[in-house]
Amino acid sequence: MTISYSGNFFRLLLRWKGSIWRSVWRELFLFLFLFYFIRFSAPHFFNYTDPTDSKGYRKIFKVMCNEFHEYTKMIPLTFLLGFYVSNVVSRWWRQFETLRWPEDFLSILCLLLPSKESRPARHQIARYLNLTSALAWRDVSTKIRLRFPSLRNIIDAGLLTEKEYEKLQDINEPSPGIRWLTPLHWVQQLIDAEITAGRGSVNYVSVATNELKAYRISFRRLYCHDWVCVPLVYTQVAALATYSYFFFCLFGRQDLNHDDFYSLDAFFPLFTVVQFLFFVGWFKVGQDLMRPFGLDDDDFELSYILDRNIVTSFTIVDSLQDDDPPKFEEDVFWKHHNEQQQMHQSMFLPRVPTSLKWGRIDLSRNAHKHPPKLHTYLEMKNQDPEEYKNRKNNKFIAW
């Protein structure tokens, strides 16, 4: 589910669910295990294989560590991860924008079919809109698939009837990819039947058709995002650059000066761990957001959105449409209408220009009708330079 958070800085750092600690703790534990294994096993290995250091294994190891440290400077990790994660995050937000809300179309539907005789049609159309969401989302979302493993589960949820199930099965056999589109076609047929029967307003047909088209396009875009992922080679480049960088850090960040006990790196690679949290956590952001319809902490809560849409849809077409609006009652603004009108008119009365420290400013509401003059074009009354030198008290220009 999507993690919402609020609070101060320190409380956010201690959050576990959906945090960087939960994303990278396994990789960080493996990195520290290998790092300390190399640190403690290398001296014992050299003492066992070359006690007198006649073969120069220690020198070769130091040279290799220094070379690996230089290799880490040659990998443009910041550039690769920045470009990779920015594309993934923008794609992640575009996928969220494909989630269409039914209340826009249903509000227009209430204007198109406002009578009480059209209530069964409105109710059926609202159910078909949510049926389309359930059919489409179960193809791309793991949570919706677990909620509706088969179409029989959709029947148990009340979004589908037995006759409609049989029709969907008959349509799905010759054309498997059109099943989610079928309820939207039924919506068009219901609207056409109501208009033909004279129970609808023809003025809103075009607007309702455009909204229904936008509703259908949103699901098609969602399928396109699910079919076409970020290129695999791009993900491989980002993963290879990240993990190879810290492979070189296993050797390049070793403390080779064993006599310096005052160095922090002699006990714990602090800055290397900070880099690991930044870069691996950065890469994990791209990995987690690449497919936001799974079971991760920050994936979209489509099950909640579907429940919310069902409740909202039936409330609009049944309760709100059949309930008359409240009768007019005098409120505070209506009682003081005359006072507000007088106050409103007084705001447009001309005002006397006010002289301020920084110059004369016209505070009149009609000042925008007279474009201001630039001070560079103002005529000087007296062009004698000696007089202006003596006027030391006048420090500001009159605009």
UniProtKB/Swiss-Prot annotation:
Keyword tags: Cell membrane, Chloride, Chloride channel, Ion channel, Ion transport, Membrane, Transmembrane, Transmembrane helix, Transport
GO cellular component: chloride channel complex; plasma membrane
Residues spanning the membrane: 28-48, 74-93, 232-252, 266-286
GO terms, molecular function: chloride channel activity
Pfam families documented for this protein: Bestrophin (PF01062)
Function, in words: Forms chloride channels.
PANTHER family in alphabetical order: BESTROPHIN, BESTROPHIN HOMOLOG 9
Protein name: Bestrophin homolog 9
Subunit structure: Forms oligomers.
Membrane protein topology class: Multi-pass membrane protein
Location of the protein in the cell: Cell membrane
UniProt keyword annotation of Ion transport present: yes
Protein family according to the UniProt entry: Belongs to the anion channel-forming bestrophin (TC 1.A.46) family. Calcium-sensitive chloride channel subfamily.
Organism per entry: Caenorhabditis elegans
Keyword Transmembrane: yes
